[in-house]
Amino acid sequence: MYKAETRGISVTVTPRFVEEESSPDESRYFFAYTVEITNNGRDKVQLRSRHWRIVDGRGALQEVRGAGVVGKQPVLGPGESFSYTSGCPLPTPNGTMEGTYTMATADGESFEAAIPAFSLDVPHVRRVMH
């Protein structure tokens, strides 16, 4: 489990390798990750967009930007949480992900909430970084 907190917004990520959706002979490794976003602050916020930086085991960077997460732009009041699970295919048995969520307060102020850097690793495969 990996965790970051920005301005009272806690982001926790739990990744896992999904063997049944992977095909190592075809250089396809699929990882799922579950994210829990908790508003520990005093103000209501809305998740507006996401920005991911995905780096495979060869060092190739892919950036992904988009509105919301899993088709939603959740609003979180103080003490509320939102969880979702998504996935990421890689051409290597390991890599990393990190990023930010753009959050907006009720008065229209925007800020970036950090998504912690986390590793994607096939169990029992030695990690080689380039």
From Swiss-Prot:
Gene3D superfamilies: ApaG domain. This is Protein ApaG. Residues 3-127 form the ApaG domain. It comes from Methylobacterium sp. (strain 4-46). GO terms for biological process: error-free translesion synthesis. It comes from the Bacteria. It holds the Pfam family DUF525. PROSITE patterns: APAG.
